[in-house]
UniProtKB/Swiss-Prot annotation:
Subcellular localization, as worded in the UniProt entry: Plastid, Chloroplast stroma
UniProt source species: Arabis hirsuta
EC numbers on record: 3.4.21.92
One GO CC term on file: chloroplast stroma
Gene3D superfamilies: 2-enoyl-CoA Hydratase, Chain A, domain 1
Name of the gene encoding the protein in the UniProt record: clpP
Entry keyword annotation includes Amino-acid biosynthesis: no
Cited function: Cleaves peptides in various proteins in a process that requires ATP hydrolysis. Has a chymotrypsin-like activity. Plays a major role in the degradation of misfolded proteins.
InterPro entries: ClpP (IPR001907), ClpP/crotonase-like_dom_sf (IPR029045), ClpP/TepA (IPR023562), ClpP_His_AS (IPR033135)
Reactions performed catalytically: Hydrolysis of proteins to small peptides in the presence of ATP and magnesium. alpha-casein is the usual test substrate. In the absence of ATP, only oligopeptides shorter than five residues are hydrolyzed (such as succinyl-Leu-Tyr-|-NHMec, and Leu-Tyr-Leu-|-Tyr-Trp, in which cleavage of the -Tyr-|-Leu- and -Tyr-|-Trp bonds also occurs)
Annotated S-S bridges: none
Descriptive protein name: ATP-dependent Clp protease proteolytic subunit
PROSITE patterns: CLP_PROTEASE_HIS (PS00382)
Length: 196
């Protein structure tokens, strides 16, 4: 039996009456938001609009992005990453469960010194993939060139944000590399592992 989205009480500052709002609405008001699904344009646009709105509302208070995602669309994930770099408040990233593929890219995009992984979190990095095997030859070549450009961009970001040499990052991206929270910390993807 599904429970739906829980409702929690909320009282706006200066108001006497308490209203019931869904839990995500309440957490957004506290500047906490979640990437708990595959990354696509819909969730990307929702997170981007939240970050922009909350940074306009108050540009000195940190934002907190909790990540438990298998990854998803590369361009949508890169849009989230770019927004995190653009907004004035620091975006703290918290990896919990799984941060794989483009979700690990978003995780590494948090403010330096403010990237955290829960103790049992898993992180996975790899090279971007495509389904160009279904395309005709001309499209195949164009898509392969675009994929190579995206891979170079992602590699540069990992190098910049982890402090690892380009050859280490490039080698790791050749295949699926799964890491524990402490391994992700040693790799420079997160700065801290939350204490159990």
């Amino acid at each position: 039996m599904p429970i739906g989205v829980p409702k929690v009480p909320f009282r706006s500052p200066g108001e006497g009456d308490t209203s019931w709002v869904d839990i995500y609405n309440r957490l957004y008001r506290e500047r906490l938001f979640f990437l708990g699904q595959e990354v696509d344009t819909e969730i990307s646009n929702q997170l981007i609009s939240l970050m922009i709105y909350l940074s306009i509302e108050k540009d000195t208070k940190d934002l907190y992005l909790f990540i438990n995602s298998p990854g998803g669309w590369v361009i949508s994930g890169m849009a989230i990453y770019d927004t995190m770099q653009f907004v004035r408040p620091d975006v703290q990233t918290i990896g919990m469960g799984l941060a794989a593929s483009i979700a690990s890219f978003i995780l590494v995009g948090g403010a330096i010194t403010k990237r955290i992984a829960f103790p049992h979190a898993r992180v996975m990095i790899h090279q971007p993939a495509s389904s160009f095997y279904e395309a005709q030859t001309g499209e195949f070549i164009l898509e392969a060139e675009e994929l190579l450009k995206i891979r170079e961009t992602i590699t540069r970001v990992y190098v910049q944000r982890t402090g690892k040499p380009i050859w280490v990052v490039s080698e790791d991206m050749e295949r699926d590399v799964f890491m524990s929270a402490t391994e992700a910390q040693a790799h420079g993807i997160v700065d801290l592992v939350a204490v159990q």
